[in-house]
Amino acid sequence: MEAKEQDVSLGANKFPERQPLGIAAQSQDEPKDYQEPPPAPLFEPSELTSWSFYRAGIAEFIATFLFLYITVLTVMGVVRESSKCKTVGIQGIAWAFGGMIFALVYCTAGISGGHINPAVTFGLFLARKLSLTRAIFYMVMQVLGAICGAGVVKGFEGKQRFGDLNGGANFVAPGYTKGDGLGAEIVGTFILVYTVFSATDAKRSARDSHVPILAPLPIGFAVFLVHLATIPITGTGINPARSLGAAIVFNKKIGWNDHWIFWVGPFIGAALAALYHQVVIRAIPFKSK
């Protein structure tokens, strides 16, 4: 009997007590299979002497240039036709934006992080994923790339036709208020930046490192879905560089009237997403040192 009781006891100890749903199997005492990157310093002067710093900025410039080139050309093709049945329509525009983000994030993630968006850069800066030095440099390069991308499209289309087709610029559509537009930009950018944080989380990256496509895919898909929802409201900004580049090249009053929405909205959305992910999801302020 004693032997049997011992066997039962040993057998029971072979299996850990059932955990509630949603609780990670890994205990806090076990070593992590991933490493949290240390917080980036606010200023990093040594970056200015590093080639990788400038290479990353160039990658952001080229990626944003290509992003504006493809997406604004797609918008031009849809707006040009009187019958939307002859074009790819809103779905095609959404696929162009989402597909380009997927491809460009995949190409540049290992070089610059694949931001291609000042709102993404701002959110990651607030989470101390990069320094202020790098954040400002990225934003400048993104805006310059966007201006050049929209400028090339204007060269293809011609000044007259580019102006007649509104140059792919963002503005609040008739029937919607500025508050509607601002809300759409805040929520849309929140979805995007929250997806970026989740897809690039250190723990998830360690687990899915053998499938490098898994980070760009949900980010691109988030951009696609947000465009499907908000193109009828604002043309979908959620990217201040995209909005500013198109507005500068278009350079008409309608492109500037509501332009502040496409900076304030995305930056608020990015800040809320960073706060939610870092404080609520990851509980970083509450973790023991």
Curated annotation (Swiss-Prot):
Motif NPA 1 per UniProt: ranges: 117-119
Q: What residue intervals hold the motif NPA 2?
A: 239-241
Q: Where is this region: Disordered?
A: 1-39
Name where it mostly resides.
membrane
Compartment(s) where it occurs, according to its Swiss-Prot or TrEMBL record: Cell membrane
What GO cellular component is one of the record's annotations?
Answer: plasma membrane
Q: How does it sit in the membrane?
A: Multi-pass membrane protein
PROSITE patterns documented for this protein: MIP
Keywords from the named record: Cell membrane, Membrane, Repeat, Stress response, Transmembrane, Transmembrane helix, Transport
Supply the induction statement. By water stress, heat shock and to a small extent by abscisic acid (ABA). Induced within 30 minutes after the loss of leaf turgor.
- Pfam families, per database record: MIP
Ranges of the Cytoplasmic topological domain? 1-57, 113-135, 200-212, 282-289
Cite the GO molecular-function annotations of the record: channel activity
* Ranges of the Extracellular topological domain: 79-91, 157-178, 234-260
Stretches that traverse the bilayer: 58-78, 92-112, 136-156, 179-199, 213-233, 261-281
Q: What InterPro entries does the record point to?
A: Aquaporin-like, Aquaporin_transptr, MIP, MIP_CS
Domain comment quoted from the record: Aquaporins contain two tandem repeats each containing three membrane-spanning domains and a pore-forming loop with the signature motif Asn-Pro-Ala (NPA).
What the protein does comes down to: Aquaporins facilitate the transport of water and small neutral solutes across cell membranes.
The family classification in the record reads: Belongs to the MIP/aquaporin (TC 1.A.8) family. PIP (TC 1.A.8.11) subfamily.
Q: What is this protein called?
A: Probable aquaporin PIP-type 7a
Q: Which organism is it from?
A: Pisum sativum
Q: What gene name is given for the protein in this entry? A: TRG-31
